[in-house]
Amino acid sequence: MKSTIFFLFLFCAFTTSYLPSAIADFVLDNEGNPLENGGTYYILSDITAFGGIRAAPTGNERCPLTVVQSRNELDKGIGTIISSPYRIRFIAEGHPLSLKFDSFAVIMLCVGIPTEWSVVEDLPEGPAVKIGENKDAMDGWFRLERVSDDEFNNYKLVFCPQQAEDDKCGDIGISIDHDDGTRRLVVSKNKPLVVQFQKLDKESLAKKNHGLSRSE
């Protein structure tokens, strides 16, 4: 009996530690469906004046290593794979996440670069979101938080350094390059970037790309 009680105590303690993740609200796409763990989505602006999230070269970069918001409102950006290390089907608010661009979307621009997002320190624009290998990349993870209670399913991206308290996490916002207007994603104390998610239909996209290649 004592061993059974001890086992139940350990079981309750373990499951309780994961309770906030279990009861957290699911993150919803723009059709009201929960985001799938490991699914691919366009990350879109909540306003129509700007486009989606993609990679672009900035400064002296030869490859598209900087994560930016497109200034073209018709550009949905690059599909982004959103994954949690938890063995769960759907993404919920507050879950630790890794984000990476679909490799096929950038392979034509610069072969072989890692496409996982990271936050890089010691840049003029502040801690900025980048892809590729970088020695100044911070250890940490992203998470999603809802910013409105309406039907539009608006969220903000948050970056949390590894082993940091919640008050050390920072919202992902926009830093505008005054020379060329590039809208870089950065960790910001100002207004966060508010986004929505649109599921990427890979099968339809593959058919479209196949049709384009045959017509060229």
Curated annotation (Swiss-Prot):
SMART domains with a match to the protein in the record: STI (SM00452)
Cystine pairings recorded for this chain: C63-C110, C160-C169
UniProt signal peptide: 1-24
Keyword tags: Disulfide bond, Protease inhibitor, Serine protease inhibitor, Signal
Chain positions of site Reactive bond for trypsin: R87, I88
MF GO annotations: serine-type endopeptidase inhibitor activity
Record-linked InterPro entries: Kunitz_inhibitor_STI-like_sf, Prot_inh_Kunz-lg
Proregion residues excised on maturation: 206-216
Gene3D superfamilies hit by this protein: 2.80.10.50
Function: Inhibition of trypsin.
Extra facts: The sequence of variant A is shown. Electrophoresis identifies three genetically distinct variants, A, B, and C, that are inherited as codominant alleles.
Family assignment from sequence similarity: Belongs to the protease inhibitor I3 (leguminous Kunitz-type inhibitor) family.
Name of protein: Trypsin inhibitor A
Organism: Glycine max (Soybean)
Gene coding for it: KTI3
